[in-house]
């Protein structure tokens, strides 16, 4: 007998053993097929969230599956140094002590960051172990460790030498609070209610005539370089080429024609501010306007405008109105609007809904800013030598496109290729510099004249310069730069290692769609460029995990679920404190508390890692989003318990018994048709689950396994086995015990990639009993294969007959309201001999007996059913009055529920305005109630006959 199922106990025991025994490490036998997979490195600052649990379940499932298939497997884990996120965490800790990074200086500050990383930076990798990730922790990397730092420097220098890295002045996303450029992924567009200001721009040669320009950002007016109109807009064609007076400045700017302007939107006149708007930058570039920067790096108005051409060359500047100098951009907006009003330039102000770009870390409004940055050229062809391969001579962007177009890298689902190509066809040069202290410092040095020397170290730079006293570039690299190198930086490049031969390209990358461009495309670029190989053969794109109503999980909504809380459980008080602490908007705390109490009135019970993993696997379809329902996790906790209890039953009936195993045992003979049926179903399940794993359809694998284990094995075969073990001859009992063990052991191996802990625990007991302990751990045992024998169709046909008979009897009981504790005799009238079937019916359907007769006995009240040509009668005395009263009460209860639901669905506007999933649930509930009502009415009608 097994003890009570306790996930926590078995999880800690087995994971420690797996890791200490080295089971996660590849054996580096290059004659074996390889399977490798890269972990998208989570931020070192991070903690496990549902998205991690989702994709790590898929990655670990694949790794365990291919390990069991005999592959040399490598799942390489690591963490990302997360430049901005990590620097903010440490700066906030210092701020609590009234210390800034500038007080410490760069060197001391970086020491503090490394100290923090060593103490707190491993949280997420420990949590990965809790989920059961069988990653090779001996190969764990950090994107700023010594090996990765050398690789980053080598790549940067080579790209620079090939003319693919340059420094230039371009428009970037600028976070004025952080004081650095940020990537598009670090910018959140927030819908806000703002204003649209309509302003008069008078003609220089006739100030009484003016064009009306509308803008949501009047503070950027100081940097206007032109006003654009559509070339086909007849209202303004006569003005193209004329000069306008720029309000508040006295400067004149030209009217230009550009198809970017939608003539039917607004007034049809658009102010062009190339230094402070990305779209305007492109318009200005087409017309070679000036780039006029009017803000400093803190987003305050400059005293003197900084002017450049599109080559980044400085042009003569000019003074800005003195009264605005030094004002924050929003204070300047307020003052300028007042001045526009006073001077007669403001026509009207209209309410306007707009999308405001904000930094995801600071919440500050992102400013498009003209700054000097380092860039990787996406479309330029490399200078100098390259490895001789199919990608040689192509630009980085073209290499990435060719890798996908040729099929060397495929997307799953395939429709993501369109998204990938859309991004690649509109690609811009990549801004790789950040104005931070934490990160890979750019390997470039400057002399006093501003000449730049890119080198692997300072000595090499000084050799290039022919002098000492150089100053190193202070900027660091974008975090995505080092992340883009992990397919080969983790395998020993630039050396030719066995790891590179065995594990590049990896088999699959499992990731979310939001980083297809930021990470996936850049890994393809860098890996093809430096190794001539693609980084991975397939990209499996999974959806985003949302809450049960389809809403994005966020702390402010109060709908975040911590995977570790699902594994361990958490009380309501602790859960409330966890969810309401550290909110970006503290005023949302009552709303968060209310939502939490509604969803988890008693907190979250412990589910265990296996239940969490099976839940995630069941959601791993090819959709764009995953609506996580806690009730499903509860259901799969019950599934794990079902497996545990089923194993207990098998052990109780096989321990110290002759099961047909052992060195001298002969193959059992005399299998019953249920034995043959479950073996056939096992073979079918092996084929289906293997296909599902091979095609990354973990949802289908989970569905198939659940159905086989719960329905076929537990609900049907175990119940039939009880009959066989009680009534069968010695040979039949031996064959049944043999089959019980054989099928259970194989099922545990089938389940192992998804639920590794419980399967390891049970397999260690079950496998030795059926000569299947071929390895020290189930994770090293072979994945089940079909036995090669044909499915016995006769057994399948016999099982169908039996299931139909049992179903018919159960329906008879249900339709006539026979209570579960009431036993009755069954009479069967059939031309066929049903003896092989009838022996199973009493135990399966709570009968006193099941007897085949030549003709059914006379009984006007006894219910009769027809099944496969046989007539079935339950001989039972029914108290018609009592049963009629019971059914009438049930009908009344159902009618009230139907009336309530019909009223809800017929309420005006409900089906149009309510969330679609709620409407569908209500309709499904209505159909179920109607079905129940029909059955009750049918029973009442029979009682009246």
What kind of feature is each model-predicted range?
Residues 198, 388, 422-481, 485, ...:
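Feature 926 captures the class I aminoacyl-tRNA synthetase adenylation module centered on the KMSKS loop
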Residues 64-72, 93-106, 126, 130-135, ...:
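Secondary-structure transition/capping motifs at alpha-helix termini
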Residues 53-63, 70, 79-80, 148-151, ...:
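Structured ligand/cofactor/substrate-binding pocket environments in proteins
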Residues 31-39, 61, 97-100, 125-132, ...:
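Active-site-adjacent bridging/hinge elements
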Residues 1-232, 256, 273-286, 290-308, ...:
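N-terminal, positively charged nucleic-acid-binding surface of large information/translation enzymes
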């Amino acid at each position: 007998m097994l003890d009570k199922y306790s996930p926590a106990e078995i999880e800690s025991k087995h994971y420690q053993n797996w890791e200490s025994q080295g089971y996660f490490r590849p054996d580096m036998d290059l004659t074996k097929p390889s399977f490798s997979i890269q972990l998208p490195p989570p931020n070192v600052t991070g903690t496990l969230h549902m998205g991690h649990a989702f994709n790590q379940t898929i990655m670990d499932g694949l790794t365990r599956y291919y390990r069991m298939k005999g592959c040399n497997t490598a799942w390489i884990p690591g963490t990302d140094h997360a430049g901005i996120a990590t620097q903010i965490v440490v700066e906030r800790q210092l701020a609590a002590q009234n210390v800034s990074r500038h007080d410490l200086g760069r060197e001391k500050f970086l020491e503090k960051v490394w100290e923090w990383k060593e103490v707190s930076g491993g949280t997420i990798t420990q949590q990965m172990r809790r989920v059961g990730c069988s990653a090779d922790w001996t190969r764990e990397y950090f994107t700023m460790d010594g090996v990765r730092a050398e690789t980053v420097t080598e790549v940067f220098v080579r790209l620079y030498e090939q003319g693919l890295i340059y420094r230039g002045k371009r428009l970037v996303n600028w976070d004025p609070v952080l004081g650095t450029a940020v990537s598009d992924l670090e910018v959140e567009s927030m819908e806000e209610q703002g204003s649209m200001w309509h302003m008069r721009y008078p003609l220089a040669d006739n100030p009484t005539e003016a064009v009306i320009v509308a803008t949501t950002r009047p503070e950027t007016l100081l940097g206007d370089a032109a006003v654009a109109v559509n070339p086909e807009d007849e209202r303004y064609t006569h003005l193209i080429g004329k000069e306008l007076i720029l309000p508040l400045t006295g400067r004149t700017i030209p009217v230009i024609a550009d198809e970017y302007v939608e003539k039917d939107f607004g007034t049809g006149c658009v102010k062009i501010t190339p230094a402070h708007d990305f779209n305007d930058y492109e318009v200005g570039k087409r017309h070679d306007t000036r780039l006029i920067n009017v803000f400093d790096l803190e987003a305050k108005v400059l005293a003197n405008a900084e002017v450049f051409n599109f080559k980044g060359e400085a042009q003569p500047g000019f003074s800005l109105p003195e009264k605005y100098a030094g004002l924050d951009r929003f204070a300047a907006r307020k003052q300028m609007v007042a001045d526009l009003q006073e001077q007669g330039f403001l026509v009207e102000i209209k309410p306007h809904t707009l999308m405001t770009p904000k930094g995801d870390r600071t919440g500050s409004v992102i400013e498009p800013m003209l700054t000097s940055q380092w860039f990787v050229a996406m479309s330029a062809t490399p200078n100098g030598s390259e490895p001789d391969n199919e990608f040689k001579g192509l630009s980085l962007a073209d290499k990435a496109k060719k890798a996908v177009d040729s099929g060397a890298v495929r997307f799953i689902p395939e429709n993501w290729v369109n998204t990938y190509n859309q991004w690649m066809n509109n690609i811009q040069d990549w801004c790789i510099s950040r104005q931070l202290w934490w990160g890979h410092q750019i390997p470039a040095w400057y002399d006093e004249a501003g000449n730049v020397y890119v080198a692997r170290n300072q000595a090499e730079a000084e050799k290039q310069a022919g002098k000492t006293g150089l100053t190193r570039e202070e900027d660091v690299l974008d975090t995505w730069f080092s992340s883009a190198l992990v397919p080969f930086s983790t395998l020993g490049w630039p050396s030719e290692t066995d790891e590179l031969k065995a594990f590049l390209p990896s088999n699959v990358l499992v990731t979310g769609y939001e980083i297809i461009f930021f990470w996936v495309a850049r890994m393809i670029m860098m890996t093809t460029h430096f190794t001539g190989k693609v980084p991975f053969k397939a990209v499996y794109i999974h959806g985003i995990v949302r809450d049960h109503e389809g809403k994005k999980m966020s702390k402010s909504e109060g709908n975040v679920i911590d995977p570790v809380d699902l594994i361990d459980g958490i009380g309501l008080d602790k859960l409330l404190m966890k969810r309401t602490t550290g909110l970006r908007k503290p005023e949302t705390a009552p709303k968060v508390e209310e939502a939490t109490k509604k969803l988890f009135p008693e907190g979250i019970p412990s589910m265990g890692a296996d239940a969490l993993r099976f839940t995630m696997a069941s959601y791993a379809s090819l959709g764009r989003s995953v609506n996580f329902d806690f009730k499903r996790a509860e259901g799969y906790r019950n599934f794990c318990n079902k497996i545990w209890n089923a194993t207990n039953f098998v052990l109780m009936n096989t321990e110290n018994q002759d099961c047909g195993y052992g060195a001298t045992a002969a193959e059992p003979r005399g299998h019953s048709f249920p034995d043959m049926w479950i073996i056939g179903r096992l073979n079918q399940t092996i084929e289906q689950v293997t296909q599902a794993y091979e095609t990354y359809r973990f949802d289908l694998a989970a569905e198939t396994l659940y159905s086989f284990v719960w329905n076929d094995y537990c609900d049907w075969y175990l119940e039939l086995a009880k009959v066989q073990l009680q009534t069968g001859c010695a040979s039949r009992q031996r064959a049944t015990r043999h089959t019980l063990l054989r099928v259970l052991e194989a099922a545990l191996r089938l389940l192992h990639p998804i639920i590794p802990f419980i399967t390891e625990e049970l397999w260690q007991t079950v496998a030795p009993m059926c000569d299947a302990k071929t390895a020290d751990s189930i994770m090293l045992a072979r994945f089940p294969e079909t036995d090669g024998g044909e499915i016995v169709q006769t057994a399948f046909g016999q099982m169908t007959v039996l299931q139909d008979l049992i179903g018919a009897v159960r329906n008879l009981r249900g339709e006539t309201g026979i209570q579960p504790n009431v036993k009755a005799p069954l009479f069967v009238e059939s031309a066929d001999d049903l003896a092989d079937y009838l022996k199973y019916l009493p135990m399966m359907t709570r009968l006193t007996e099941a007897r085949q007769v030549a003709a059914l006995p006379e009984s006007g009240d006894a219910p009769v059913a027809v099944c496969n040509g046989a007539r079935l009668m339950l001989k039972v005395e029914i108290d018609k009055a009592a049963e009629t009263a019971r059914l009438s009460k049930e009908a009344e209860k159902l009618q009230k529920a139907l009336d309530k639901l019909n009223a809800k669905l017929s309420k005006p506007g409900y089906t149009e305005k309510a969330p679609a999933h709620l409407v569908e649930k209500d309709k499904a509930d209505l159909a179920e109630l109607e079905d129940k009502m029909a059955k009750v009415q049918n029973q009442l009608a029979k009682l009246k006959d």
